[in-house]
Amino acid sequence: MQTAFDFKQIDLRAIRDRLSIQFEKIPDRERLDPVSQFVCSFLGSVTPDSISWGAFARLVMRYQNWDAVADAPEADIEALIRSVAYSEKKAAELKGALRKIRASYGKINFDFLVDLEIGQALFQLEQIQGVGRKTAAATLNFSTLRGRAFVVDASVLRVLRRFGFVGANASTEAAYDAVMAAADDFDADDLYELHWQLKSLGQKTCARVQAQCASCPLSDICLQRVEEGAIMVTQASACVA
């Protein structure tokens, strides 16, 4: 019986090539500036992209700049982002985050991140209340910074756990560290593409409640499928978030 699936023993480029056959090539969308990406990713925590993008668009249409958001009443911010999960909490934390950035650096921008190593940049971002590894990494990798950081969201984490690449209870930070160690030859764009491929796999095939193991291009190297079978993976899906 297979007892572990170690990405370090497998060429991640080969994994990406397999997923490229299953899914269309990920288009490189127009990048947001770092602060705008930060706000968008902040809103997107535990919220589908389509909903968080709508909330982000409403903020952009209502306010001229992020200074205006920082100075706006929390109730007004919350009303615009009410569709996202934990909207009241996010409204307060987003306002606080923008004000903290302005107080620390004199203005609301992330210019200082350009000269920092990725680890230092992640650390600085994660000092902001409400910011975890996913939001910090997305700010760096998805924005015009194009930083070499891998974004682990709920769908990606679920796939990595099921594969056995990380433990069943591994944190986002642990999954990030494991991927970055195994993908030491990947540049920022490679990590960007891998994220969206694994996210697509998690949403369309390795779904939370109804995993479609038979159609998964990576099923032969999936620890949970090998050990439990496709039926058990489907039944256990709700427990492996």
Regions found by a protein language model. Give the residues of each.
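Catalytic cores of DNA base-excision repair glycosylases
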Residues: 3-236
